[in-house]
Amino acid sequence: MLLFPVTAQRRVRPLKLRAIYDGEALMTTKSAPYHAHIYYESQDRVTAEHLHQELSNAQGVGHFVSVLFVGEMRDKKVGPHPKPQFEVHFHEDALPRVLTLIKASGLAALVHPLTDDDLADHTSLSVWIGEPLPLDHSVLDPPGMNQGIARFGKSDV
């Protein structure tokens, strides 16, 4: 069951991933790729560091086996993100636990599936935890050219 709505006006074509283990094409509900962008201000950096460490330590273990990557803490604006943030890559089956940790931290976050439509991912398909922030949509990839796909689970740049 996907937790993010697809708008009635527009359908987003599901992304086909290559399985990490056996090379077969893969796109199931439990393996659907997600990103969380977790934002912080300088006064919240210690809280962000604790959450970053907690996610890093849990990565690949137990209920967090589907958390594949915890990115660097970026202390400045990067891409469409207007303030410091770090990124977490995970499969949908980790979504409830990742959301619980983020909510408990009190930090704002943008959580979205990863499809071939970067704009939809960051707008109509996303969910905000905390106060939404204005994103710079002009730097997002055009539909069908999402660069986030190639770096999923590997890199945040």
Language model segments and positions:
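N-terminal amphipathic/basic-hydrophobic helices that include classical n-h-c signal peptides
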Residues: 1-26
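Long, contiguous binding/interaction regions
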Residues: 20-157
